[in-house]
Amino acid sequence: MRGLRRADVEVTLIDRQNFYLFQPLAYQVATGSLSAEEVAVPLRQIVRRQQHTRVILGEVTGFDLASRHVVVDHLPDGTRGVEIPYDALIVAGGSRYSYFGHDEWAAHAPELKSLAGALDLRDRILLAFEAAETETDEAKRDAWLTFVVVGAGPTGVEMAGQIAELGHTLRREYRSVDTSKARVLLIEATEHVLGAFPDPLPRKAETQLVSLGVTPMLSTTVIDIDAESVEVQTADGSRTRIPARTAVWAAGVTASPLARLLAQAAGTETDRAGRIVVEPDLTVAGHTEVFALGDMVSVRGQQLHGVAPVAMQQGRHAARSIQRGTREAFRYHDKGELATIGHKRAVGVVSGVKLSGFIAWALWLGIHITYLIGFQNRLIVFTRWTFSYFTRGRGARVIHS
């Protein structure tokens, strides 16, 4: 949208939600560091100065590439089957977490790809501490104080670290239970956390996690999840059922259903993760007016991670292509990657330089403040983080459920 704000075009933005979620900070909503309104901005507020842009609240359920229109259902008044014409189309449906064929686990281990998931997790985490406070049976209390995070990519690592820190923050607010002794188990199927990061950063991240009280369980896979436990299997085949009342899912992703719909409409292929395969210029094969972006796509000849910087650069590339009428190959400029673990703890690579500790943490904070949409949100988040730095407090701990 920003790339087209000065272009001589009419823009129609269609989304089933009326807000944009800054996903990299969703886990801070889940752990009470930030409120929902600080990481989610109304779409109409974002484009309020772009008079050539209109917003439609609805869900895209079909594409007719021959006649160049999309089909929209679930409008606010219940209308279905509305056809929206286009000259150029950009599809950026994102992705969702994959439960590897066990969608029933989602009821017991919510994900962090959505604002609803983050708010659900916040309620579950805070309610777990409340339940532990009144539980007299020691085994049941331990289960309430055991938190399992599945997946040790950046989101899983950040979530595990934040839950551990939350336990330390709350210890003076409870009388019958020591929240700082909460167990946080980080389950990862591979041999290291942050497997996409270069050595020695995964090992440094593991050390920092352990210092916070997180227990990494590596080379371990999840076999089953229910409301009261998580069953895991280690590399030697042995199985263990862990009593735990709170689980978080951050393992594996699959493309948005829009990828499959678009691929079917174009007669093109998808990969194993359900992502539509697009040309190097980000257009759909045979349709130079249709662009697909972000982690719902696989670009021919390129291996790109499903992270926000990739999608942002792809968005700018598509906007330039539409304005100039050109179709040049997309080239990703990798500026690095950072993962925060906790207070003054982080690891990352920036411009080829490997960083860890306070410097990496400060860079992470600065970069994420910069990418937030809206001056007001940047100011509020900066103020909250500054307050938290000096007091270790968390001001967004209201239970809604």
Predicted regions and their residues:
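A Rossmann-like FAD-binding core segment of flavoenzymes
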Residues: 55-72, 76-77, 164-280, 286
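FAD-site-proximal beta/loop scaffold in flavoenzymes
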Residues: 108-136, 229, 241-313, 320
